[in-house]
Amino acid sequence: MTLPASPPRYAVIGNPIAHSRSPQIHAMFSAQTGRPLRYERLLAPVDGFLPTVQAFRESGGLGLNVTVPFKLEAYALAEARLSERARLAGAVNTLSWRDGAWHGCNTDGVGLVNDLLRLGVALAGARVLLVGAGGAARGVLQPLAAAGCARIHIVNRTAARAAELAAAWRAAAPRTGTQVSAGALAQAAEPGGWDVAINATASGLQGAAPDLPGGLYAPDALAYDMMYGARPTAFMRQAEADGAARCADGLGMLVGQAAESFHIWHGVRPDPGPVLLALRTELLAAG
């Protein structure tokens, strides 16, 4: 008698990790596409990323989503086998075991761009304000440029960090038609306003918004916060008061980056729409 094969094993690794919605998202993608899988949460000690990954691989693991605080360690693990997106992001959030080695990719920016397109944003020729200069901001520069944005202006509480990120991008990135500039938060205003403003800071964790000046938005502009919740974030409320025509949170980005990871692992692109609707309904019910 032949025993049925175990479904392929995947996981999300981080610390903390109990809050992660990734198992729920990938279970819905699995049901939608008919691709059986086992997907779990892996809590790694802050100094134990590599041993945890090794044990996961020895148990048959084939892919990992990587979250805080391990994206840089995942980058180092796969440094010889990085996608262009991961190389330019300087961080890895998706590991795939292929040909006897871990390969690294970064799907955060693709998740953001796909969600902006879902929301009807015309990114070709768009002027984008990117608030924040950390890993979240760096991870979305390449996909935004690839989508044809005319200008990306990075602003940060510490202006020097924004300038460093812009300079690093210009040095490492292929030539595109996208102008990347930088400044302080107080230098966020643009004549005519921005078409899209993206909050890539963690200010929402404290219920706060970045200290931005007023008059930021073009007539049909969208304000987008990478954070998400049952209620509009502080950044979204700030943007609405400043005249942004529309506001959105980052739940669609979360689902979108997971969909890209699923595609990398399984060769099938799931539909994020039903999953996003289910998560939004759940959030609203809990809130």
UniProtKB/Swiss-Prot annotation:
The keyword tRNA processing does not apply. Shikimate binds at S20, R21, S22, T67, N93, D108, Y228. One of its GO terms (cellular component) is cytosol. The active site is at K71 (proton acceptor). InterPro entries: Aminoacid_DH-like_N_sf, NAD(P)-bd_dom_sf, SDH_C, Shikimate_DH, Shikimate_DH-bd_N, Shikimate_DH_fam, Shikm_DH/Glu-tRNA_Rdtase. Pathway: Metabolic intermediate biosynthesis; chorismate biosynthesis; chorismate from D-erythrose 4-phosphate and phosphoenolpyruvate: step 4/7. It catalyses: shikimate + NADP(+) = 3-dehydroshikimate + NADPH + H(+). Gene3D superfamilies: Leucine Dehydrogenase, chain A, domain 1 (3.40.50.10860), NAD(P)-binding Rossmann-like Domain (3.40.50.720). SUPFAM superfamilies: Aminoacid dehydrogenase-like, N-terminal domain (SSF53223), NAD(P)-binding Rossmann-fold domains (SSF51735). Keywords: Amino-acid biosynthesis, Aromatic amino acid biosynthesis, NADP, Oxidoreductase. Its EC number is 1.1.1.25. GO terms for molecular function: NADP binding; shikimate 3-dehydrogenase (NADP+) activity. It comes from the Bacteria. Belongs to the shikimate dehydrogenase family. Involved in the biosynthesis of the chorismate, which leads to the biosynthesis of aromatic amino acids. Catalyzes the reversible NADPH linked reduction of 3-dehydroshikimate (DHSA) to yield shikimate (SA). Homodimer. This is Shikimate dehydrogenase (NADP(+)). It comes from Bordetella pertussis (strain Tohama I / ATCC BAA-589 / NCTC 13251). The gene is aroE.
